[in-house]
Amino acid sequence: MANDPSHRVVIVGGGAGGLELAAKLGRKHGPQCVTLVDSRPMHIWKPSLHEAAAGTLDIYQEGLSYLMLANLCGFTFALGELQAVDRARRVVTVDEVLDGHGDMVLPPRELPYDTLVLALGSVSNFFNTPGAAEHAVTLDTTDNAEQFRLTMLKAMVQVDQAKVRDPSARLDVVIVGGGATGVELAVELHEAGGIVAAYGLPNFRADRDLAITLVEGAPRILAALPEKISRAAHTRLTELGIRVETDCRVAEVAARSIKTADGREFAAGLCMWAAGIQGLPLMAQLDMPLNRIGQLVVNGRLESPDPHILALGDCCAVPRGENGTVPARAQAAHQEASYLVRKVTARIRGTAEPQAPYEYRDHGSLVSLGQDAGVGSLMGRLAGRGLFVSGTLARVMYMSLHLMHHHAVLGTWRTATLALARLLMRRTHPRVKLH
């Protein structure tokens, strides 16, 4: 059936779900119907930001240009941050874009829509912890990851120099939050520290001079995953010399330390906050229902109270069961994008929309425990049980998740070419970004 070229779809947010939706709709309906808005010029798969923070992934090599993707996949890309949504006029305002010198590259723009899809993601939730916003780094964006990487590299160089006059000098890193991001970052930092030491830091030894502490408020790390996965990850962290503190709630973050609710204090030359999410402040401007952490409340068909506004991913709360919500995970965003392709296509073609609600399917969880190990549970629950995997197999399967995302956007041949190019590049570059 023919498209209605006058039906304008604007997708705000080029994360995993938003980009997959734009790519699939663009291939079907073309750039005259589909526009993707994002505040950054490059796409990075967010689950890999912990590798960017450790320096084991170079965001400038791994990033995909939105303009390139728009050309390949048939959508229009608008660079800029979402400033406002005028629901009455059905228009979004995209903020101006400035260069590094503060000169304007693009002015503010208004983009009209018939269907608006919010895929804004989430930001870190500090839970009103004193000092956290001022002294802790997050992994919300590639800029955050790059800031942490540079700060970490500088701190290791300083410790290397300080060892000459003070043999006890060391770098203390505290990671708040024992979910997948916190666990993966802890292992990645440990491995990166050992690699960096081999590149011109003769006095620095990661096993001696890099102290990593993972702090988790729940009784165990990876509390949302099966206990067997949690135990395996805890064992791996302990074997690497990473200190794990569970049942430990952070009461305050200072410039060089954190204080816990039970009165303890941990040295923290660097503090990474990975302990929860919340919706972006902009969500409050929509004048629609939000949940307690600022996510837009949608129904099972991913519809907001405004029939022209849909949502997917971490920015919204999707009902699951009687009282639950769909977890904020990459696989959920992928599934929601696939659901919305059918729904939005029906709108563009003027046909009946599917009435069956979106149903989240848990295909399991994989956690990276370094460059050669992982742990996870596959296929959700088979006959009431998950299939436990660990070691190199789990790591290979974890890496395949990134390729699956690229495949959804780029297709088979381009994904294979990209994977080969990155493999060859890693043979000629250091394993950790050093500049």
What are these model-derived regions, one by one?
Residues M1-S6, F75-D172, M272:
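FAD-binding core/adjacent interface of flavoenzyme oxidoreductases
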Residues A2-A84, V183-L225, M272, V396:
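Beta1-alpha1 glycine-rich phosphate/pyrophosphate-binding loop at the start
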Residues S6, H29, V341-H435:
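C-terminal, flexible cofactor-proximal segment of oxidoreductases
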Residues V12-G13, L118, V176-G177:
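Conserved N-terminal Rossmann-fold NAD(P)-binding element of oxidoreductases
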Residues P31, C73, F77-E96, H190-G300, ...:
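A Rossmann-like FAD-binding core segment of flavoenzymes
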Residues L49-L57, A133-V137, I229, D287-P289, ...:
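Short glycine-enriched, charge-decorated loop/helix-capping segments at active-site entrances
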Residues E134-K163, R256-K259, E265-S338, R342:
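FAD-site-proximal beta/loop scaffold in flavoenzymes
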Residues F148-D207:
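Rossmann-like NAD(P)H-binding beta-loop-alpha module
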